[in-house]
Amino acid sequence: MLSNSSILITGGTGSFGNAFVPMTLKRFNPKRIVIFSRDEMKQWEMAKLYKDDPRIRFFIGDVRDKERLRRALDGIDFVVHAAATKIVPPAEYDPLSVLKPM
């Protein structure tokens, strides 16, 4: 199902993305995998691992930014939503800090 498809993974530089991307490349032959995350440093580090693989693309953005997400979804067949807030207590104390109206 994922072979020859375009996949967007939100939060793609996190622990799930770092496991999902190599597994997907090994088990399937996707047309492209777009790593969508807001962490430029983690994207840079991950890009070094896949510098010779033209199927891997990187897209800086936040899932709370509707227009940026819409641009990232262009031509995408499947979405794996792995974006999350890692530090939960501050979000529980101030839920509005992690929300953005769309």
Each predicted region: which residue ranges?
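A short, basic/flexible loop-to-alpha-helix module at the beginning of a structural domain
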Residues: M1-S5, I87
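Glycine/Thr-rich phosphate-binding loops of Rossmann-like dinucleotide-binding domains
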Residues: G17, Q43, V88-P89
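Short alpha-helix adjacent to the SAM-binding motif of class I
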Residues: K42-L49
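NAD(P)H-binding glycine-rich loop region in Rossmannoid oxidoreductase-like domains
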Residues: Y50-K100
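SDR active-site strand-loop-helix element
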Residues: T10, F36, V79-A83
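Conserved glycine-rich Rossmann-like NAD(P)H-binding loop of the short-chain dehydrogenase/reductase
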Residues: F28-K42
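N-terminal Rossmann NAD(P)H-binding glycine-rich loop of SDR-like oxidoreductase domains
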Residues: S5-R27
